[in-house]
């Protein structure tokens, strides 16, 4: 969980911007998208091997 403590004399916009940046660094949005739908283990393995093949030929 990302926490942001609003500093004294800090605008809400800048605090929200810091919070969004922390969430992006933590990978929360990607994790939510990944877990949105169930993915069978065989499909996970297939995607993983395709990604490895793609990296190898790049």
Curated annotation (Swiss-Prot):
Record Gene3D superfamilies: Ribosomal protein S8
GO molecular function, one term: structural constituent of ribosome
InterPro entries the record matches: Ribosomal_bS21, Ribosomal_bS21_CS, Ribosomal_bS21_sf
Ranges of compositional bias, category Basic residues: 43-58
Cellular compartments per GO CC: ribonucleoprotein complex; ribosome
Record-level GO BP terms: translation
Region (Disordered): 32-58
Pfam family of the protein (one): Ribosomal_S21
Listed Basic and acidic residues bias regions: 32-42
Keywords: Ribonucleoprotein, Ribosomal protein
PANTHER family recorded: MITOCHONDRIAL 28S RIBOSOMAL PROTEIN S21, SMALL RIBOSOMAL SUBUNIT PROTEIN BS21
NCBIfam families attached to this UniProt entry: S21p
HAMAP family found in the cross-reference section: Ribosomal_bS21
Family: Belongs to the bacterial ribosomal protein bS21 family.
Protein name: Small ribosomal subunit protein bS21
Organism in which the protein naturally occurs: Lachnoclostridium phytofermentans (strain ATCC 700394 / DSM 18823 / ISDg)
Gene: rpsU
